[in-house]
């Protein structure tokens, strides 16, 4: 299993990061004689521009040049953000539109991240693991190989307080929809967490847990194979 960042390392990373309020600005006007700052990314024609820049840099430029701007639309989706989204260029996994994966998260080969899933800084998604729609892996939460994290489930994050232990999900675990795994919990290999369960204590390998709080109700050997199958075809990438 991949070694994840410590809470102290994540805290230091966030503290030291240059905070960013990026803007996307659409403007129409007469810009033929306007010189744009070198740190602006500018696209378009002499009378219509799309600009990518920081809010702190845009303000003085706008104040100096608003007389030549006829129309303006500004898009801003964050303020003083410390952690950008992860560059997925070299990620060998299936990641669907609308997933939010932050920098310093680890996505291993063959993983599947579905629409609306959130993977926070320091989290680890193991090889062949599927994180279903709207599921959340909080900071430092770690899954092993071939895990299924059901839709809407939450693996609690632990960055603050830094002394807390992260959630660890071992290999071949099935987590049902809308389950919650609290900080410090380890779910043993091959276990099944029922939909809607709230897991407050470690789960033994091969156990099936359900309820609030979750309790062992049987063993996975008592569950039909078809109900705990991990489908490799869903993890297949282009040949």
Curated annotation (Swiss-Prot):
Reaction(s) catalysed (UniProt annotation): (S)-2,3,4,5-tetrahydrodipicolinate + acetyl-CoA + H2O = L-2-acetamido-6-oxoheptanedioate + CoA
Root EC class: transferase
Keywords for the protein's UniProt record, in alphabetical order: Acyltransferase, Amino-acid biosynthesis, Diaminopimelate biosynthesis, Lysine biosynthesis, Repeat, Transferase
Protein biosynthesis found in the keyword field: no
Pathway(s) it belongs to: Amino-acid biosynthesis; L-lysine biosynthesis via DAP pathway; LL-2,6-diaminopimelate from (S)-tetrahydrodipicolinate (acetylase route): step 1/3
InterPro entries: DapH, DapH_N, Hexapep, Hexapep_transf_CS, Trans_hexapeptide_repeat, Trimer_LpxA-like_sf
Pfam families: DapH_N, Hexapep_2
GO molecular function: tetrahydrodipicolinate N-acetyltransferase activity
EC number: 2.3.1.89
Keyword Transferase: yes
Similarity comment: family membership: Belongs to the transferase hexapeptide repeat family. DapH subfamily.
HAMAP family: DapH
Role summary: Catalyzes the transfer of an acetyl group from acetyl-CoA to tetrahydrodipicolinate.
Protein name (record): 2,3,4,5-tetrahydropyridine-2,6-dicarboxylate N-acetyltransferase
Species this protein is from: Staphylococcus saprophyticus subsp. saprophyticus (strain ATCC 15305 / DSM 20229 / NCIMB 8711 / NCTC 7292 / S-41)
